[in-house]
């Protein structure tokens, strides 16, 4: 089973911030068990939604240079609300610091404008071929996958404006 925690990218400013949404549906299988009479998105999956949004930001910031962008640390994570079916978790992540292999970000998730989760994340980025050159083709595939995923989830404002019908005077 594969989970998706970014349904759409609302805003993307490479090197600065990203805003994404996750629309929680009763179709999410884990809701049957978490919790049976009070279905809510598990906290660890809210953290994963922040991680996924942050990884898209890092990938776009560096023009998809790295095939692997993984969570290294989650600091000061606070859960402040529930995400129930029919609600939308809006995640915003901002880059605080870019270092050699690590990127530090501040991330938060809200539901209807109210805080649900926030924390600081450290993501580590690298290529598999850095340690195993034979995996260079896998790196290329994964980088292309990131690009394709972002192309499906985000349309820059200038593209949307170009598609808008022109009004004649």
Model-based region annotation:
Residues 1-41, 159-169:
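Catalytic strand-loop segment that frames the active site of acyl-thioester-processing enzymes
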Residues 3-5, 89, 103:
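Hydrophobic core residues within well-ordered beta-strands of beta-rich domains
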Residues 9, 50, 113:
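A residue-level signal for conserved active-site and pocket-lining positions in enzyme catalytic cores
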Residues 22, 92-95:
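Short, hydrophobic/aromatic-enriched beta-strand segments in well-ordered soluble domains
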Residues 53-90, 118, 124-126:
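Hydrophobic beta-strand-centered segment that forms part of the acyl-chain substrate-binding groove
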């Amino acid at each position: 089973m594969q989970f998706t925690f970014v349904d759409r990218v609302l805003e993307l400013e490479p090197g600065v911030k990203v805003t994404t949404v996750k629309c929680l549906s009763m179709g999410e299988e884990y809701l049957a068990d978490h919790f049976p009479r009070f279905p809510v998105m598990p906290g660890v999956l809210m953290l994963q939604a922040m991680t996924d949004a942050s990884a898209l930001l890092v990938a776009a910031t560096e023009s998809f240079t790295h095939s692997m962008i993984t969570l290294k640390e989650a600091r000061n994570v606070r859960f402040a609300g529930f995400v129930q079916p029919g609600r939308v978790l809006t995640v915003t992540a901002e880059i605080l610091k870019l270092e050699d292999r690590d990127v530090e970000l501040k991330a938060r998730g809200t539901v209807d404008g109210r805080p649900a989760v926030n924390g600081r994340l450290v993501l580590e980025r690298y290529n598999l071929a850095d340690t195993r050159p034979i995996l260079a083709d896998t790196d290329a595939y994964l980088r292309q996958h990131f690009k394709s995923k972002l192309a499906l989830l985000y349309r820059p404002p200038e593209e949307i404006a170009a598609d808008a019908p022109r009004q004649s005077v």
